[in-house]
Amino acid sequence: MTRLRQDSGGQGATNGGNGNGGKGSSPAIKLEGVSKAFNDKKVLDDITLEVAEGTGFCLLGRSGTGKSVTLKHIMGLLRPDSGKVFVHGKDVTALSGLELAEVRRSMGFLFQNSALFDSISVGENVAFPMRRHTDWPDAKIREAAKGKLAEVGLDKDYDKMPGDLSGGMRKRAGLARAMALDPDILLVDEPSAGLDPITSDEIDQLLVDLKKKGTTIVAVTHNIPSARHIGDQLAMLHEGHLIAQGTAEEFDKSDDELVRAFMRSESSG
């Protein structure tokens, strides 16, 4: 298994069967020695990892171990106390506001609660990023939004309100909105949260399908079956430290009892 400070995110190209991991000469995402503290409590302690382009990367760990904080650093919502964060080779910790906005346009975000606007239709939720970031005419935006909804099986739900959707349908709609601008990277926070096992599997498969098309997926999850399904590489955080990184098979065979115990659990939240 790959251990702390041994960068091997690119190994994901040899695992998971999608064959996309080697298409880029540099990693899609790279963290170098990232540390972060809140009120003198260190949440991330010298985190170094890489995510190969076109692969699935799952961050594992119990609640409060720094997984979502790591995701926020990649998004540029937080700046590390020390260390650097690179997205497509650009150090997001050193970018201006305009430069960071440009990098963010290459990323999509699927939040745990789907984060849909309840006051507008499902279709207009998906269309929102297009209206904000393109100069497309209304007809093209509507057509594109319908296409994104069709990709997640919601082609008949454009005019429905978010409150009319089930939890799984809301998650699908959130995914359609996250992919509205065809981002290279998709960041996902707890894709299985609040979903039954069948719906969770369906969401996982949608993420795998996106990965097969070349999208880099970074998912924070407690759900071990989801991590096995999505992740070419897994990384486990514990008390702010990166204690393991490797494939699911390597995690299963780890000599670290904490890692093996986590992998044996169906859900560790």
Language-model-detected regions and their locations in the chain:
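Conserved ABC ATPase signature
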Residues: 161-165, 169
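Helix N-cap at the start of a conserved alpha-helix in ABC-type nucleotide-binding domains
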Residues: 197-199
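Catalytic Walker B motif of ABC-type/P-loop ATPase nucleotide-binding domains
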Residues: 186-189
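Helix-to-loop junction immediately C-terminal to a conserved catalytic motif
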Residues: 75
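Conserved ABC ATPase "signature" region
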Residues: 90-91, 138-157
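A short, proline-enriched helix->beta-strand linker immediately N-terminal to the Walker B motif
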Residues: 180-184
